[in-house]
Amino acid sequence: MKTSKLNFLTLVASTGLALAFLSGCTSNTGTTQSAKLYSEEELGLRKATIYNENKTLVKEFEYSKEPAGASKVYERSFENAPPMIPHDVEGMMDMSREINMCTSCHLPEVAEAAAATPMPKSHFFNMRTGEDLKGAMDEARYNCSQCHTPQANVTPLVDNRFRPEFRGEDAKNRSNLIDTLNEGVK
């Protein structure tokens, strides 16, 4: 009987403390500022409802129309980043293991003659098995647009203040990922 009375008193006391604590946390007294509430239309970059696409306005944009070989090469976003596609890609993006228009200019043996960026050594190496494929392109690399994307002529919605740091001048336009992949690991 004594134990159950003690348990009951402990329960009442702890409940009272919990209620006092919670009421202090939710009190509106004092000099607290109220948070600004945002409507659903103000959320995100689109400034439109998130429930349907009826009022979503997409600004007109165009991809580069410069032909391959005549376009400027973009500096990479960071060291060993996949290079962006600076040229027109009309008719080039239907890719399969058997047909890939990108390789007709970007394979190392033809890249210089085509004035194209050559595919790096990492594309001729199986990252899963660690096997050097001796000049054969890794089958995991045939879908070029998985990493490389054409650039549209648009104004960024958000200012990008990121400034990359490259360890060498050539890293701005070339990849040495296969040579640096295990840095700091071993």
Swiss-Prot record:
One of its GO terms (biological process) is anaerobic respiration. Gene3D superfamilies: Flavocytochrome C3, Chain A. It is found in: Periplasm. One of its GO terms (molecular function) is metal ion binding. Heme c 2 binds at residues 123, 144, 147-148. Disruption phenotype: Mutants fail to grow by nitrate respiration and also fail to reduce nitrate and contain increased amounts of NapA. GO terms for cellular component: periplasmic space. Disulfide bonds: none annotated. InterPro entries: Multihaem_cyt_sf (IPR036280), NapB (IPR005591). Heme c 1 binds at residues 87, 102, 105-106. Keywords: Electron transport, Heme, Iron, Metal-binding, Periplasm, Signal, Transport. Electron transfer subunit of the periplasmic nitrate reductase complex NapAB. Transfers electrons to NapA subunit, thus allowing electron flow between membrane and periplasm. Essential for periplasmic nitrate reduction with nitrate as the terminal electron acceptor. Belongs to the NapB family. This is Periplasmic nitrate reductase, electron transfer subunit. It comes from Wolinella succinogenes (strain ATCC 29543 / DSM 1740 / CCUG 13145 / JCM 31913 / LMG 7466 / NCTC 11488 / FDC 602W). The gene is napB.
